[in-house]
Structure formats: C-alpha cells, structure tokens
Amino acid sequence: EMLRSLVGSEMCIRDSFLDAAREAGYLEIQPPYVVNAASGYGTGQLPDKEGQMYHCNEDDLYLIPTAEVPVTNLYRDVIFNESDLPIKNTAYSACFRREAGSYGKDVRGLNRLHQFDKVEIVQIQHPDHSYEALEEMKAHVQSLVERLELPWHILRLCGGDMSFTSAITFDFEVYSAAQKRWLEVSSVSNFESYQANRLKCRYRGADKKTHLCHTLNGSALALPRIMAALLENNQTPEGIKIPKVLVPYCGFDIID
C-alpha cells in the first residue's frame, strides 16, 4: 500500500509541475527519447558530454540526457518574425545518463540514476529580453520548491562549474535531512546565442535582417531528488506528510 502511495505521489508531483508550467505560459511538448548526433551538437551535449550519453551504435542515435535536446532542436533552421518571440515550451521526459566515473555516496539511492524523470522548461528569446526571461525562470523554479515546503537555496555557478555552452547558470538545491547535505534539483541557464548559432535559430528584425535568438532552459524540476527530499523532510509520527499543494492531486495528505 505504501509503495502504491509513493508511486502515485511521484505522478502527482509531475502533474503539479506541468500544470505550473502551463499556467506560466509554457506550451507542453511530448519529446522523443532518441535523437541523432546533430541534435546533440546543436545544444552542446556533443562532443563535450559524449561519454555521459548512451549511444546506439547500429543506428548512430543517442538517448536524451535531458528534454532540452529535442525541444530546443525543434527550432533548428527556423527564422521567426520578431513578433513571434518568445517561444516557451515545457516537456516531461525520462532522462538517460551513463554517469561515467561516478562512485561512492553520490551514486546511492536516488542521488544519481542512469534513468530519471524530469520536467524541463525552454525559452527561445529576443536577445534584448533573455536576462529578464532568466529571472522569470528562476522565479518559476523558486515557486515550485517553496510550494513543496522544502528547505532550499540558490547558487550562481562559477565558470569552471558551468557547461561551456552557458553564459550564466544558477543551481537550485534542496536539503537532504538523511544525508545532511544539499542536493541539486534544478539548473537554470541562459546560453545567449551559443546554441542558436549552432542551430541557426534566428529571427527577422525590424531592419529586415536576420539575427540569432537567445536560448534558455531550466529543470522544473528533477523528480527523484524532489521525492527523496519530501520523504526525508516530511516525516511525522503519523507518517509522511504530503505538502498542501499536492493534496488536490494525490487525494490524501499522509503516507502511512
């Protein structure tokens, strides 16, 4: 019975994240889980993270490490009218990562998995507004963790910790009561024109010339670590308390 409640709770978390994204103006996309190498190069996972991606040798295809890859690649070779921007998409998907070289306590339990589920948000933006969009996306992720009543903080990453494709990245972390440390549940990044240049994702301005768009994405949020944090931080003598925001989705407020 508890296992059934736990599985149901994770689906409720997913649905609440997708509803929040739709309410924030994101159009939901159902992405493919298998992409070609060109897609990986377009968003910058290849060649940088090739060792972390699962490769299907016979077909020369890759399992997606994040929905960012197929969603952003929808706009390869697209020229938008300036008035079309911004484009805001969300997607729920499984994510696949080899996690080569990972070892020790960081790979135990739900910390680091070869397959995990995540809701992603992606924006294609006018360059003049991409940093406003970044703040909007950070506020969106902040609202998710706050509504789940989890202890959290935000970090601005230094250059050495960021993806080479990113101009700026912020990580959101929630506290693991059992492990007594912080776990990353979201990264929000502005890639400026880096991905757009690889993808030839452009818009036509008032000057009738084409210009590169800016791309942004963020996890909103990664489910396994959120689930672990909820289980660890919400234990009571009666059972595991469900955050108020999830009760309408779950139909119960305690897992006992």
Please tell me what each predicted stretch does.
Residues 9-10, 14-256:
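TRNA-recognition modules of translation machinery and tRNA-sensing kinases, especially anticodon-binding
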Residues 1-8:
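Single conserved hydrophobic/aromatic residue that forms the stacking wall/gate
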